[in-house]
Amino acid sequence: HYHLTDFDKKEMPSLDKYNHTIHSDDQSQSSFKPFEENQGSSSYPQGQCTWYVDQRMKQFGQYIHSNLGDAHHWNNRAAREGYQVSSTPKKHTAVVFEAGQLGADTQYGHVAFVEKVNADGSIIISESNVKGLGVISYRTIDADDASQLDYITGK
């Protein structure tokens, strides 16, 4: 039911080459970290995109409200909870695909995690449940498409 990969580049981006690329806007001052499931609880169903983004943000000391609901609700509900929501891509934020937007599920939408913002405005994201439940994958979203999405900064 997802058609998200219809909108990305066909080759998987290599995150290893970014290990030594730290920009001044990188607040974590750390290189790429492989995904590790947080041992704490999550209110999001395991393997879903919402679960993954919740877990991935915790790896970088960013926390997202535990009851934002389906992916396409995250931006509006996060704004009501006092989170910064912007249309400008930023590293280590949640990116929200509205229901049906850029191939996202037409009922639930989709969320992913921004690993890197490239100089040309494209973004590299990591996500779960695009290639199968609990399967973590990476892709590049071009600058034009990235500018249509909302980004949530954790607390």
Q: Where do the language-model regions lie?
A:
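Secreted/periplasmic proteins that engage bacterial cell-wall peptidoglycan
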Residues: T21-V111, E127
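N-terminal secretion targeting segments of exported proteins
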Residues: H1-T21, K155
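Aromatic- and glycine-rich peptidoglycan recognition patches
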Residues: E115-K155
